[in-house]
Structures are given as C-alpha cells and as structure tokens.
C-alpha cells in the first residue's frame, strides 16, 4: 500500500487517488479535468498528477485525432495548473516503441521519458531515462530496484556502477552509428 511504501501512518489530505475504470473513456478525461480544477483551488496548487494507464483515456492508441486531442488537453492542463502530469504507457511487446499514435504524440510532448526494464541481474529492474528535454538521458543515473520479500514491495537498490553508465553510452553511440 502507498502509505507503507512512503512510511507514513496516515494519508495526507492533499493526496487523492481515484479508480476511473468504472467510467467511460470520455468520462475519465472529464473527471481528471474537473478534479484538477477543484483541487487546484482547494489546495492552492497541484504538485503532481499521475495517470497510470493513459491508453485508457482513448478508444484506440492508433486513432491519431483522438490521441492528439487527449495529449493536447493534458498539455494544456499542465500549463494552466503549472504542474507535472506523469503518464504511464506501456511499450509495444518486445520493443522500445510506445503504443500507436498515442505513444508518438506523448513522446513528442513529453519533457522526460523513463523506461523500466529488466536488468542483466534477473532479480532487478532498472530505470533508464530515454529522453530529457533540457539535458542528456545519458547523464541521468541508472536506478535499480527489486522485490524485497521481507518488505513485501519493490525497494530501491541504488544506482548502477559508473562503468555500466559508460558502457551504456558506448552502446548508444554504436547504435546511432
């Protein structure tokens, strides 16, 4: 549970979490818009919005017009409320390409794209920056995490050694060449 992970006894009043799966796709986006407006004025700002499953806001990730409309609306809301909107979108199976027109549009507008992948060490996963608008993704540390049975959750395991970072730079350059 979120509170246990954050080592907090109680949920702060400002933290809101909603399950929108019982709504139609159009109602989901409207609920996000309305709640952002409400909570912006109620709390004097919004620190972060997380949409876990942005593909659930559209009928088809391959519908260009619908994808552009949803991303434009989220981009507009981020600007109006001066906040970060973090969107989760899965890659196509066995690839590093985001799904459909939705993925393409999200890549175009995103300030940062992070990827969570299996590490060479099979019990760990690694978080990699694929895009950083004001910098190089190669300058962002590779963060490791793994399932901890005792804690009952994934835990941070540190950064990959500097040598790994240098190997990544070399691999990226070879792939570009």
Give the residues covered by each predicted segment.
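Conserved alpha/beta core segments of nucleic-acid transaction machinery
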Residues: 31, 134-177
